[in-house]
C-alpha cells in the first residue's frame, strides 16, 4: 500500500476553489476517451457525458462514498455496439448495454456469495489477455478508415491525403504529449491530441464550424428512451454480441481496483468490497442504457490523476461528475464535439486501439504465461485467429449470430475449461489470482 503524503483523504471535503480545480482535472482526464467512444459508434457525445456523470454519482452512492473512481465510456463495447446497431438500430444497442449491466450485477452478487475464485477459473489471463488483444486489433480497420477517407461512412470510400495528414498530425501530437509531458499533462494526451488535431484540421478547411455558431447554449441531449424512441426486444443475437464482453471487462475492473487500492493505501476489494464496486458499474451501465449512453467502466486515466495529485476525495470525483453532467446540456459544447473531423478521431485511435491490444499483451507478460506450454499456446492462437479473422457462427432462423471477439471469448473459455492442466500449473494459477 502507498505510504506517500496524502493531500486529501477519501472522505475529506476540499475548499470551494480547490474543489472546482481538482474536479476539472478529472474531467479533462476522462473527457477525450469518454466522447471518443460515442463518436466512433454513432451515438451522442452529449448523452455520454450525462451518463458518465450520472453513472459516477450512482457508483459513489453504491460504494458508500469509499472508492474514488470515475466512470466513463467503455472501449471494449465499441465493436459489439457497431455490430448490433447495424442489424437492429440504436435501440438494439441499448438493449445490449442493458443486458451487459445485468450481467455485471449478477457477477457482483455471485462474488459477494462465492468470492472471486470461480471468475478467475473461467477467465484466467491466458483467455482474457488474447481477447483484449482482439478487441484492440479488431478496431484497427475502423481507425484506418476514419484516418484515410473523406467520409468513412460513405457507401463508396474516397481516399483523401488531406484527411490522412490531419490524422498523422493528430497522432504525432498525441505521442509527443504522452512521452515528453510530465505531471498532469501526461495524463491527457488524448485530449491535447484532439485539440491540436482539430486546430490543424481548421487550417486544412475540413471543419464545418457553422453548427457551433448556430447551436444554442442550452440544449437537451438526444436521449434514446425505451418505449418512446424504440420498442425493446431481447434477442439471442444481441445477447451473444454484448454479454461475453461484460465478462471480459470484469478482469479490467478488478485490475483497476487493485491499482487504486495501492495508490490510495486502502484495500477497496475488502472494504467496501469488490462486489459493491462491480454493482456500482452495473447500475451505471443500466442507467446509461436507459437514456442512450454507452456502457461504462472505471477509468485508468483518473487513477493516474489520483496518483499524481494525492487528492483522493470522493467529493472531488463527485464534483467532476456533476460538471460532466452539466456539460452534456451545453449545446455549443455538444456541437463543438460533433464538429471534430473523423480524421482527428482516426489519428487518436491509431494509438488508443493499439494501446488496448498492447494491454492484453502486457497482461500475458505480467502473469508470466508460459508459451512453451502447448495448452497456453493453443488457447491464445485460436482466440487470436477467430477474433482478428472475424469468424462467426450464424443460424438463419431468428437471425442469431456470434462473431469476432464474442465468439473468440466463448471459444477461449471453453478451451480453458476442457483442456487438461498440469497440477503444478493449477497451483501457480491459484496463487496468481488470489485476491
From Swiss-Prot:
Q: Which GO terms describe its molecular function?
A: uracil:monoatomic cation symporter activity
Q: Which family does the record claim for this protein?
A: Belongs to the nucleobase:cation symporter-2 (NCS2) (TC 2.A.40) family.
Q: Does this entry carry the keyword Transferase?
A: no
Question: What name does this protein carry?
Answer: Uracil permease
Name one process (GO BP) from the record: uracil import across plasma membrane
- What are the UniProt keywords, alphabetically? Cell membrane, Membrane, Transmembrane, Transmembrane helix, Transport
NCBIfam families with a match to the protein in the record: ncs2
InterPro entries the record matches = NCS2 (IPR006043), Xan_ur_permease (IPR006042)
Look up keyword Glycoprotein and say if it applies: no
**Compartments where located:** Cell membrane
Please classify the protein's predominant subcellular localization into one broad category. Answer: membrane
Task of the protein: Transport of uracil in the cell.
Species of origin reads Bacillus subtilis (strain 168)
Q: How does it sit in the membrane?
A: Multi-pass membrane protein
Q: Which Pfam families match?
A: Xan_ur_permease
Q: A single GO CC term, please? A: plasma membrane
Give TM regions. 17-37, 42-62, 67-87, 91-111, 122-142, 161-181, 191-213, 234-254, 311-331, 336-356, 376-396, 399-419
Amino acid at each position: 500500500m502507498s505510504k506517500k503524503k496524502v493531500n486529501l483523504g477519501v472522505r475529506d471535503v476540499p475548499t470551494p476553489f480547490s474543489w472546482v480545480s481538482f474536479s476539472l482535472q478529472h474531467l479533462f482526464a476522462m473527457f477525450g476517451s469518454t466522447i471518443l467512444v460515442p463518436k466512433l459508434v454513432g451515438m451522442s457525445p452529449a448523452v455520454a457525458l450525462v451518463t458518465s456523470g450520472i453513472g459516477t454519482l450512482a457508483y459513489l452512492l453504491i460504494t458508500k462514498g469509499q472508492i474514488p473512481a470515475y466512470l466513463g465510456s467503455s472501449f471494449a463495447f465499441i465493436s459489439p455496439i457497431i455490430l448490433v446497431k447495424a442489424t437492429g438500430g440504436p435501440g438494439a444497442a441499448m438493449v445490449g448495454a442493458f443486458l451487459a449491466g445485468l450481467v455485471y450485477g449478477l457477477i457482483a452478487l455471485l462474488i459477494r456469495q462465492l468470492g472471486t475464485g470461480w471468475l478467475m477459473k473461467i477467465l484466467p489471463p491466458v483467455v482474457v489477455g488474447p481477447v483484449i488483444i482482439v478487441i484492440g486489433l479488431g478496431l484497427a480497420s475502423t481507425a484506418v478508415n476514419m484516418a484515410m477517407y473523406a467520409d468513412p461512412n460513405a457507401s463508396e470510400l474516397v481516399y483523401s491525403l488531406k484527411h490522412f495528414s490531419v490524422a498523422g498530425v493528430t497522432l504525432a501530437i498525441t505521442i509527443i504529449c504522452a512521452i515528453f509531458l510530465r505531471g498532469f499533462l501526461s495524463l491527457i494526451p488524448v485530449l491535447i491530441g484532439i485539440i491540436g488535431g482539430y486546430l490543424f484540421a481548421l487550417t486544412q478547411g475540413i471543419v464545418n464550424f457553422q453548427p457551433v455558431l448556430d447551436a444554442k447554449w442550452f440544449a437537451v441531449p438526444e436521449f434514446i428512451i425505451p418505449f418512446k424512441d424504440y420498442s425493446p426486444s431481447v434477442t439471442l443475437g444481441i445477447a451473444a454480441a454484448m454479454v461475453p464482453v461484460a465478462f471480459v471487462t470484469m478482469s479490467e475492473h478488478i485490475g483497476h481496483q487493485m491499482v487504486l487500492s495501492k495508490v490510495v493505501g486502502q484495500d477497496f476489494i475488502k472494504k467496501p468490497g469488490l462486489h459493491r464496486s462491480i454493482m456500482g458499474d452495473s447500475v451505471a451501465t443500466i442507467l446509461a442504457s436507459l437514456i442512450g449512453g454507452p456502457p461504462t467502466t472505471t477509468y485508468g486515466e483518473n487513477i493516474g490523476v489520483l496518483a499524481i495529485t494525492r487528492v483522493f476525495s470522493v467529493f472531488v470525483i463527485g464534483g467532476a461528475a456533476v460538471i460532466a453532467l452539466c456539460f452534456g446540456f451545453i449545446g455549443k459544447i455538444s456541437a463543438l464535439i460533433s464538429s471534430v473531423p473523423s480524421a482527428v478521431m482516426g489519428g487518436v485511435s491509431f494509438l488508443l486501439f493499439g494501446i488496448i491490444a498492447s494491454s492484453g499483451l502486457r497482461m500475458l507478460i505480467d502473469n508470466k504465461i508460459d508459451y512453451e506450454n502447448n495448452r497456453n499456446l493453443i488457447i491464445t492462437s485460436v482466440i487470436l485467429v477467430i477474433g482478428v479473422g472475424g469468424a462467426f457462427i450464424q443460424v438463419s432462423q431468428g437471425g442469431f449470430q456470434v462473431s469476432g471477439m464474442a465468439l473468440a471469448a466463448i471459444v477461449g473459455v471453453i478451451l480453458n475449461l476442457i483442456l487438461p492442466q498440469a497440477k503444478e500449473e493449477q497451483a501457480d494459477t491459484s496463487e496468481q489470482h488470489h485476491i
